[in-house]
């Protein structure tokens, strides 16, 4: 499954089966409240709706597992979602706002909506000093767009290319919509 492959790539060395086993074990005890706090990054912020629906389909989000508060990456993290291209940020914003408006989750709490709104604002408003390159977004085959490349994105690109050399899984196969991150030099 796509969610599983992505999670194993992001948390290299972690086996998805261990995550499933732990969540299924804890799910047996209705007296336990589980808090999910996924750290948002370049690799997963745009996929938040799919992640939440996957967790809900697995039974990990229900009336007992109902506290979800996505977290920003720590200061100095190279893979901060704020470094995404502006056009990609706008697509992500639209997707997340629609997801929250449609209320497809059994979890309908204001803290989750406020947190996602705050993360979107933080992402859109972020500005820095950087150079610009041109590339095509995956959903737009005709027009190129620009990517403001920071040292952090250069490091992400370097890391991705290194991981592709040593891992069995290739970044482009797992994150095709983010393949532009491999070419930010």
Identify the meaning behind each predicted range:
Residues 1-185:
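Radical SAM enzyme [4Fe-4S]-AdoMet core and its adjacent flexible, acidic
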